[in-house]
């Protein structure tokens, strides 16, 4: 980290876009209250496009009086370099708020902080924060320690004594992972985390127009009420959130997860470490915008209070993955039957293990057509104790959506679900305020998640260059190594043997492991998984990228993420390779660096620098075919 403190000037930009992006702000006073009554029969069909709301409702921009409280770094006064720990020390008064973009680790050495309405005391624990510029960034508010006595942990001896006395809150900020290097492979996402290179985080100034995540009282009240149920529940608690696109569904679940795991942490005075870790089960059924799943996949994972990653980590946060199923597409509509089967398999496995902890269910923001089928099926399987509807203007979601009056489980017996109607977020274009940044739409964010998955070397390290610049792994197929292939486009193995190699090279595939040799039918030299075989019951390993295939010698060159390479080597055989519809980002095949003039004379896979002549291979054949209108004359 450089000794010279530089805070870059940021371009004006928005947040949240795409098929189900999170909220950036919640309008104050836009909801009249929380109701806990059974859902009545719907009278109107819910429209995903939000109805107009009060245009004078203030969005959460940090300006005016709020901007005056934003922390501004002054080196030598409230900002110090901690070279020994490769970090910086920030000193804040109790009324100041800190806005940071990027990936970083935070330790509260003195006082406390408030983040998303949750208070954190000083201690030895370090928290991981992920704040991409595509999302609204929650402010970190300085506060006092919630204790009768003042404590401090790890304060550097070189820090002036008057500084320690003057400031109520002192933080140590250190660098996080180098995931920003992955984003720079795409021209659109080069500044997804910070606006400059050289550091994984950046302190935002008031003039940078930082968009804080501001919640109204109704959202806070809902979190507080559900927190009481979480603490007092004698059995398991099951929370299900239903909402359309851009309704704030994913953000609400993320806030509830933080509330459940960090909202009631007691710490010891000696170390500042919590007494015990709480656990929450997260059933992630949204393949298009997953919170913890691999790209184009659904999963069940466990989150603990000790390792929870804060902010929007874009599926890179800490978790214990229990079950993952590759769907092969970012939308369940591509293979609907397979999606419903996979969802049922995951929820059934979670149910059979008798989990007594709180569980959160994340569904796609699809509330029309087949989306209602997904919601009804998920409700039947999950049997929620608490259901949250994010609606616009109090409109009910659908006539076809009917919530049962009673559910029954082995742990709780029969029970009536509690239903909450909450005002969803609606985006407004207000004159004079920055518009949505088009670079951060849903397709680009999905591409980033895939790049991050393929380039991940370890928990905190990512391969910064294109995969083509590194050697692939050679894996045999047939009698060892990869022992079966499956194409989701044609499960009956109707591909010709000469086309299989071409259909796999340069494509993203999923690698599964079977405990027993799979049932196959040979198609030339390729063993094809039988149509009756169910690969979703096998163990998910990783997504991978096939570089090339040597049919004669029966091996393929394949790129496997570094963080799972050890597991792949230990398993060795009985792998099943599944080809879906996952698209590889163009920057992986055609990196801008390899297209520069210095690489023009090199042989690069998939890239040709030869330029054809004008009109070469251009055929304009006139077809004397009568159009439909000709028959009417």
Swiss-Prot record:
An individual GO BP term: termination of RNA polymerase I transcription
Residues engaged in binding ATP: 243-250
Enzyme Commission numbers on file: 2.7.1.-
Family matches, as InterPro entries: Clp1/Grc3, CLP1_P, P-loop_NTPase
Tagged with keyword Transferase: yes
Superkingdom of the source species: Eukaryota
Gene Ontology MF annotations: ATP binding; polynucleotide 5'-hydroxyl-kinase activity
Subcellular location: Nucleus, Nucleolus
Example of a GO cellular component annotation carried by this entry: Las1 complex
Protein family according to the UniProt entry: Belongs to the Clp1 family. NOL9/GRC3 subfamily.
Alphabetized PANTHER family for the sequence: CLEAVAGE/POLYADENYLATION FACTOR IA SUBUNIT CLP1P, POLYNUCLEOTIDE 5'-HYDROXYL-KINASE NOL9
Main function: Polynucleotide 5'-kinase involved in rRNA processing.
The protein, known as: Polynucleotide 5'-hydroxyl-kinase GRC3
Lineage of producing organism: Eukaryota, Fungi, Dikarya, Ascomycota, Saccharomycotina
Annotated gene: GRC3
